[in-house]
């Protein structure tokens, strides 16, 4: 069942926030754009936590760079088709916390304009992407710890398999939302309603 909870547009609430939606371009695990519109939306409860995280990052001379937030269920089906591994992608029949508007994917940019090295790229579905992995160089691990501190300081929690993913505590208790914008349909992708 899908809810119609109204989501908040991050570009409107935080006009200075850097938003680089990876699923609105080909720089993701599918190798193609999934979103027809580059809209970055979150549940109002996640907006409150994000505002705190933005302030904490600024205190450190850092900037958040948003890669994904709310994700239509149709997009989740396409990601599952590209990577049907429940360690990294939630099966659309289960329901991703992104599709509830309660999860966000992001990284950090320093005061010189450089994206911090996290030791593995966004959507790199490999053990190196796990929050704490021995193959990650110490400097990159410190950057992950910094991102984690900023996000948990705002009220989010991380997950063990992706350094870039944070969500509200109890995120799964929020309802799955009706798709808020369109996706490009891949052959073989099941329609989700």
From Swiss-Prot:
<dbReference type="InterPro" id="IPR009045">
    <property type="entry name" value="Hedgehog_sig/DD-Pept_Zn-bd_sf"/>
</dbReference>
<feature type="active site" description="Proton donor/acceptor">
    <location>
        <position position="162"/>
    </location>
</feature>
<keyword id="KW-0963">Cytoplasm</keyword>
<feature type="binding site">
    <location>
        <position position="165"/>
    </location>
    <ligand>
        <name>Zn(2+)</name>
    </ligand>
</feature>
<feature type="site" description="Transition state stabilizer">
    <location>
        <position position="71"/>
    </location>
</feature>
<dbReference type="GO" id="GO:0006508">
    <property type="term" value="P:proteolysis"/>
</dbReference>
<protein>
    <recommendedName>
        <fullName>D-alanyl-D-alanine dipeptidase</fullName>
        <ecNumber>3.4.13.22</ecNumber>
    </recommendedName>
</protein>
<keyword id="KW-0479">Metal-binding</keyword>
<feature type="binding site">
    <location>
        <position position="98"/>
    </location>
    <ligand>
        <name>Zn(2+)</name>
    </ligand>
</feature>
<feature type="binding site">
    <location>
        <position position="105"/>
    </location>
    <ligand>
        <name>Zn(2+)</name>
    </ligand>
</feature>
<dbReference type="GO" id="GO:0009046">
    <property type="term" value="F:zinc D-Ala-D-Ala carboxypeptidase activity"/>
</dbReference>
<keyword id="KW-0862">Zinc</keyword>
<dbReference type="GO" id="GO:0005737">
    <property type="term" value="C:cytoplasm"/>
</dbReference>
<comment type="similarity">
    <text>Belongs to the peptidase M15D family.</text>
</comment>
<keyword id="KW-0224">Dipeptidase</keyword>
<comment type="function">
    <text>Catalyzes hydrolysis of the D-alanyl-D-alanine dipeptide. May have a role in cell-wall turnover.</text>
</comment>
<keyword id="KW-0645">Protease</keyword>
<keyword id="KW-0961">Cell wall biogenesis/degradation</keyword>
<keyword id="KW-0482">Metalloprotease</keyword>
<dbReference type="Pfam" id="PF01427">
    <property type="entry name" value="Peptidase_M15"/>
</dbReference>
<dbReference type="GO" id="GO:0008270">
    <property type="term" value="F:zinc ion binding"/>
</dbReference>
<keyword id="KW-0378">Hydrolase</keyword>
<dbReference type="GO" id="GO:0071555">
    <property type="term" value="P:cell wall organization"/>
</dbReference>
<dbReference type="GO" id="GO:0160237">
    <property type="term" value="F:D-Ala-D-Ala dipeptidase activity"/>
</dbReference>
<dbReference type="GO" id="GO:0042594">
    <property type="term" value="P:response to starvation"/>
</dbReference>
<dbReference type="InterPro" id="IPR000755">
    <property type="entry name" value="A_A_dipeptidase"/>
</dbReference>
């Amino acid at each position: 069942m899908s809810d119609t909870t109204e989501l908040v547009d991050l570009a409107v609430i935080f006009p200075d926030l850097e938003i680089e939606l990876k699923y609105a371009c080909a720089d993701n695990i599918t190798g193609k754009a999934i979103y027809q519109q580059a809209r970055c939306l979150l549940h109002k409860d996640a907006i409150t936590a994000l505002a705190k995280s933005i302030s904490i990052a600024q205190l450190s001379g850092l900037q958040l760079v948003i890669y994904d937030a709310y994700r239509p269920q149709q997009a989740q089906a396409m990601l599952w088709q590209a990577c049907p591994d429940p360690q990294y992608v939630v099966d659309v029949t289960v329901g991703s916390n992104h599709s509830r508007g309660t999860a966000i994917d992001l990284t950090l940019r320093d005061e010189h304009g450089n994206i911090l090295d996290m030791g593995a790229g966004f959507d790199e579905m490999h053990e190196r992407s796990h929050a704490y992995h021995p193959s990650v160089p110490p400097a990159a691990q410190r950057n992950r710890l910094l991102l984690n501190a900023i996000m948990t300081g705002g009220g989010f929690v991380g997950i063990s398999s992706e350094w870039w993913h944070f969500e509200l505590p109890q995120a799964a208790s929020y309802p799955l939302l009706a798709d808020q914008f369109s996706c490009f349909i891949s052959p073989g992708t099941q329609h989700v309603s």
